[in-house]
Amino acid sequence: MSIRSLLLGSAAALAATSGAQAADAIVAAEPEPMEYVRVCDAFGTGYFYIPGTETCLKIGGFIRFQTAFGPDAADSRYKQVDSTGADRSSSDWDAFSRAYISFDAKSDTEYGTLTGFFAAEFNADNDTDAGDSFIDVDEAYIQLGGLKAGFFYSWWDKGLNGETDSIGNNTEFNSIAYLYDGGSFQAGVSVDELEGTSTKSNGVGVSGIVSASVGGVSFDLLGGYDTEFEEGTIRGLLSADLGPGVFQLAGLWASNPNAYWARSEWSVAASYRFNATDKLAITPGAQYFGSLQDSLTSFGSDDAWRAGVTVDYKITEGLATRVSVQYEDEDNGDDQVFGFVRLQRDF
């Protein structure tokens, strides 16, 4: 055998071996592209697309520490030597902490924006010896365009700037509401379940609102009728940009105590939020209550008034503090000074 024949035979054998190995080789699959979270700016800041969907989600909340002061700020403590009701005591101050988290999901449909909203509070307070920390559903509702159904804050929850005013009784219900939003003009109606607020287990209430705004001035006219008590309330609220702040004025009247308002037959409240700097705001306020409630179904002849101030200071981005000091004087009652100091981190 010649050297040439030997070399050719060896080369052919190597080629055959390489071909067989190539046929049996395992080829790694190409990695699938990773889908990163995308920012959604269709509904404002803070939203992102849920991966694999066209639904935008926003997660928010706050952590709050607050110390309140005033008569019976904590009134369900028992002395360690005796846990009976006869030895119940009270305190003129109370501290608590709260964590709040919300989930807001939105998407566009042929009927308008579809929203699903859920928020919960996690409260920690040692107001009783056993402790009363609890979890509370703050809101849970579905909204499609102007139609809203679920558990949410009603139009009665809107108040004045600061912490002085009280212009709503029960402000959160399981409701079905519709609001027409024409920009500078709004009108809406709500059917509310008044569970635990009237004479029956499941009462029904109806609320209606008309709102208008022109430039820096806005006005709300709100009414509510409690079908169980067969009584109603009307309320007006004016807000106007004035100088370096916002002036607000509210007035309300009730035929008799009902689920929407029960403190007094009529009341007038006002506040002015003075924006001293970009970080500091000072809000004095006052309110007068005419013919205070004296029974479940009627008003009496006593009056009351309240005045106070609220100070807000933005420490840094996402961290702020609020101090509230209020004074109240009621006919045939003790004068009271009350308020709180709050530290809150928003996210």
Where are these regions (language model features)?
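Outer-membrane beta-barrel pore domains and translocons
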Residues: R64-Q66, A119-N123, F152-W156, S190-E195, ...
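Transmembrane beta-strands of outer-membrane beta-barrel proteins
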Residues: L57-F65, T109, L114-F118, L147-A149, ...
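Outer-membrane beta-barrel "beta-signal"
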Residues: R4, S18, A240, Y313-I315, ...
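Solvent-exposed loop/turn segments connecting transmembrane beta-strands
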Residues: A124-F134, S166-F173, L194-V204, Y225-T233, ...
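N-terminal periplasmic/intermembrane-space "pro-region" immediately following the signal or transit peptide
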Residues: M1-R64
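Detector for outer-membrane/organellar transmembrane beta-barrel domains
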Residues: S184, S201-G308
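Outer membrane beta-barrel
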Residues: G46-P71, R77-Q80, T84-G196, S207-S213
